[in-house]
């Protein structure tokens, strides 16, 4: 909230077009690498938030929380040799891991909601026009992308029982996904690979300006459900001794 207050206060006090003039002098490849296929647009409040907040900062917050929580969901107790004791209580493995996943989802939801409410209220307070639907759309994508990487982390944790490995692998996937989404459009022969990146579906179509995309939320839901299912299966059959 304080970050949103600071950023919107500064934006309300300066002429954004001056920044855009500077950005326009940069090579297109550089702006696409930094901010993705849509490039950098400092000519509007949406463009500034898109480039400065929702390209790197917000995803780092959401993915870090989700991956950290997901990686520790079962691996922490397993590493501490306390998981078998917990499961000796009247609770099934499925119930245990589901509760941990719901905890991860709630934390990620909190991060996304704070971003939506903070920037919406600050823009209203400083009389800056911003689309409530667009802000909701980018925060929804932020939430769904965080959960997707969080579920990958949960699954890795059920494979080896090591939270450090789970967090590192899922975090690595997130970094690779970001690089693919930003680099692929710069090379014609690699352009098709952007469709394998969750970051592409996160920002493609410019949700902050145009709202929720018709189907770009589907890859997030699909990946989350797939990794939720295989995590349940793997955890159910895993030997905890």
Feature annotation, model-predicted:
Residues 1-3, 162-171:
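Alpha-helical transmembrane segments and their helix-start/interface "positive-inside/aromatic belt" motifs
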Residues 5-46, 169-241:
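Terminal transmembrane helical anchor/hairpin motif
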Residues 5-7, 98-149, 153-154, 158:
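Secretory targeting signals
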Residues 50-75, 171:
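Long, hydrophobic alpha-helical segments
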Residues 63-70, 118, 151-152, 198, ...:
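Hydrophobic/aromatic residues in alpha-helical transmembrane segments
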Residues 64-67, 103, 107, 133-138, ...:
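Short alpha-helical transmembrane interface motifs in multi-pass membrane proteins
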Residues 67-87, 101:
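Transmembrane helix boundary and interhelical loop/hinge segments in multi-pass membrane proteins
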């Amino acid at each position: 909230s304080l970050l949103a207050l600071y950023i919107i206060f500064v934006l309300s006090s300066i002429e954004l077009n001056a920044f855009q003039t500077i950005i326009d002098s940069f090579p297109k490849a550089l702006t696409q690498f930094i901010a993705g296929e849509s490039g950098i647009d400092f000519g509007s409040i949406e463009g500034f938030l898109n480039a400065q907040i929702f390209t790197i900062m917000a995803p780092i917050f959401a993915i870090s929380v989700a991956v950290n929580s997901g990686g520790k969901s079962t691996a922490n107790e397993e590493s501490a040799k306390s998981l078998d004791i917990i499961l000796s209580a009247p609770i099934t493995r499925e119930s245990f891991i589901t509760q941990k996943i719901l905890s991860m989802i709630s934390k990620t939801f909190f991060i996304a909601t704070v971003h939506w409410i903070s920037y919406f209220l600050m823009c209203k307070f400083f009389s800056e026009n911003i689309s409530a639907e667009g802000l909701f759309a980018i925060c929804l994508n932020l939430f769904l992308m965080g959960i997707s990487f969080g579920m990958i982390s949960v699954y890795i944790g059920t494979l080896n029982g090591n939270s450090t490995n789970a967090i590192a692998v899922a975090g690595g996937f997130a970094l690779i996904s970001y690089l693919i989404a930003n680099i692929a459009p710069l090379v014609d022969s690699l352009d098709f690979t952007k469709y394998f990146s969750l970051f592409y579906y996160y920002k493609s179509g410019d949700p902050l300006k145009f709202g929720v995309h018709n189907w770009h939320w589907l890859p997030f839901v699909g990946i989350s459900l797939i990794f939720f299912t295989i995590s349940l299966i793997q955890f159910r059959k895993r030997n905890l001794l």
